[in-house]
Amino acid sequence: MADLPAKQTALTFQDDGTLGISHDAPVAELKPDMIIVKTAAVSVNPVDTKMESGFAKAGSIGGCDFAGTVVAVGAAVRRPVKVGDRVTGAVMGSDPNDPSSGSFATYVSAPADITLTLPESVPWAVGTSLSTVWFTVGQALFHHLLPDLAVTPSSPYAGDKPITVLVYGGSTSVGTAAIQLLKLAGLRPVTTCSPRNFDLVKSYGAEEAYDYRSPTCAADIKAATKSNLKYALDCITTKDSIAICYAALGRAGGRYTALDPYWEATAATRKTVKANWTLGITMLGKDIAWPAPYGRPGSEDARAFGAKWAAELQALLESGKMRPHPLRAKEGASWEDVLAGLKEVKEGKVSGEKLVFVF
């Protein structure tokens, strides 16, 4: 095990609530069930830009996604991982309860059983893009939206009648992952996006693509599915997206899962639709001290699903079945580059690609 410094360079929240570079951020202590990773790459997610108001406290490290080399392994770790292994994972950045948690740092502490071992053939840039997205989408689909089907990529649907699932926002990074996972689970994904991205989403496995701006979008989906659509995953979660999802679901109702809190007023318009939303970091099992409706006690159920899902993802990764979203990678990156990338995402200047930074 490498000797770890007490302090490190990281992106931490300043007194004004913005992220800035700190050269004396704390390095997390090695806990029994954790590993410590020397960061080789990070990626930027939209959630990373939403922590500046009431979420993190000054000194907390930001960021979720990381990839790097294991430098320390906790005494209680049972997963086969060792110093020198290449791994990727996601942590809870911007954590008021644990300021040393966060991926935008030289060293990252992560739960061993919710990390993935990267094959040598997978570059750092690709590896860091596979964490938050694929964990969150797995939870959304197989823990919240489709539990009644009891399907996963390792146990796909085997029925004679195809089952269609709507992915609203298929050209996002979570959307392309959802389309792939649904296809691997033996289901039939259809999606919404801009017409310029129709070819993109179909290349990931979407059976049909619909223009979300079309005034007949929901009606077109409903007609194509013969009013039998039962499942909708909302990767955008706006008032318009939930309205289209609800209107597209069949006359008998169904299930709707969002990736953010949804509009209760719209959800109340159809009592036959069971609505919920997913919060990927619950899979870490930690108490979440963020404002409502995000804050909540740690969930053993979500933690158990996270560990089980990590094993599922590891198998997909090793078999080459996880295709990343289109990436814009910066090699030889600095923390200043990451700050610039966060600004781009916050200003809505990134579309159809994911920003990753390799150090």
From Swiss-Prot:
The protein's Enzyme Commission number? 1.-.-.-
Highest taxon in the source lineage: Eukaryota
Binding residues for NADP(+), per the UniProt record?
Y212, L259, T278
Tell me the route in metabolism or biology where this protein functions.
Secondary metabolite biosynthesis
Transmembrane annotation, as ranges: none
The protein's GO terms of the molecular function aspect are:
nucleotide binding; oxidoreductase activity, acting on NAD(P)H
Alphabetical list of InterPro entries matching this protein: ADH-like_C, ADH-like_N, GroES-like_sf, NAD(P)-bd_dom_sf, PKS_ER, Trans-enoyl_RdTase-like
Which SMART domains does UniProt cross-reference here?
A: PKS_ER
Which UniProt keywords are given for this protein, alphabetically ordered? NADP, Nucleotide-binding, Oxidoreductase
Q: Which Pfam families does the record match to this protein?
A: ADH_N, ADH_zinc_N
Q: Subunit info?
A: Monomer.
Q: Which family does it belong to?
A: Belongs to the zinc-containing alcohol dehydrogenase family.
What this protein is reported to do is described as:
Trans-enoyl reductase; part of the gene cluster that mediates the biosynthesis of macrophasetins, 3-decalinoyltetramic acids (DTAs) which feature a tetramate (pyrrolidine-2,4-dione) unit connected to a decalin fragment and that have potent bioactivities. The PKS-NRPS mpsA together with its associated enoylreductase partner mpsG incorporate one unit of acetyl-CoA, seven units of malonyl-CoA, and one unit of L-alanine to assemble the linear tetramic acid intermediate corresponding to the backbone of macrophasetins.
| Name this protein carries in UniProt | Trans-enoyl reductase mpsG
**Species whose genome carries this gene:** Macrophomina phaseolina (strain MS6) (Charcoal rot fungus)
Encoding gene (name): mpsG
